Design a protein with these regions (language model features):
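Non-catalytic peripheral regions of nucleotide-handling enzymes
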Residues: 1-82
């Protein structure tokens, strides 16, 4: 089961030299993670553009879908998996 978060909260992400997430900090918790999958989404360039790098990550406590908003330069949490 997964939980899609209504608001996509901003999170802190530490990355390796290639830009892969290695640690996620959310709600004061620091979680080392490994990348399972990643993909890029670019849509609606003619109105409110979306340019995101999505990354599915797994940690010791959870599996999550996070993304880097390439327009704003901020990381967000979109979904948590049980």
């Amino acid at each position: 089961m997964s939980r899609l978060l209504r608001e996509h909260p901003a999170i802190e992400v530490e990355t390796d030299p290639t830009g892969q997430p290695t640690v996620i900090v959310w709600n004061g918790r620091r979680e080392p993670v490994e990348v399972c999958n990643r993909w890029r989404v670019e849509e609606a360039w003619w109105r409110d553009p979306i340019a995101r790098d999505y990354v599915k990550v797994v940690g010791q406590r959870w599996l999550a879908l996070v993304y880097l908003d390439r327009i704003e330069g901020t990381w967000h949490l979109e979904r948590l998996y049980d």
